[in-house]
Design a protein with these regions (language model features):
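Conserved Radical SAM active-site core
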Residues: 1-49, 53-54
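Conserved, mostly hydrophobic/aromatic
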Residues: 61
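Short, well-ordered, mixed-charge alpha-helical segments that flank or form enzyme active sites
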Residues: 7, 37-40, 69-72, 94-95
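Short amphipathic alpha-helical surface micro-motifs
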Residues: 43-45, 65-69
Length: 96
């Protein structure tokens, strides 16, 4: 399913907190059909009260809807060229 549907965000948050606490050396990835901009727009769906914390627990986010016309088998970790691989800590904290 889509991890950034609000009900899924609320369900995933305790799990991600636990992973961060117990396995801090692990790199946490998430894939979403929503864009980074949609996740940060206060008025946009699927933002909810836990979105910011959930994002802060991620290391890498692959964002954007899969577009069949943009499918490219040469891409790593994404299915279509419109999808981006985002380094979350560097994006949230540019001086990081």
């Amino acid at each position: 399913g889509e991890p950034f549907e609000p009900k899924n965000q609320r369900a995933l948050l305790p799990f991600l907190r636990r992973v961060r606490r117990e396995l801090p050396q692990k790199t946490i990835w998430s894939f979403t059909g929503f864009t980074w901009e949609e996740l940060h727009d206060p008025a946009a769906y699927p933002r909810c009260e836990v979105t910011d914390e959930l994002l802060s627990l991620l290391d890498v986010l692959v964002d954007g809807r899969y577009v069949d016309a943009l499918h490219d088998i040469s891409l790593r970790f994404r299915g279509s060229s419109n999808q981006r691989i985002i380094d979350v800590p560097k994006t949230l904290h540019p001086a990081f």
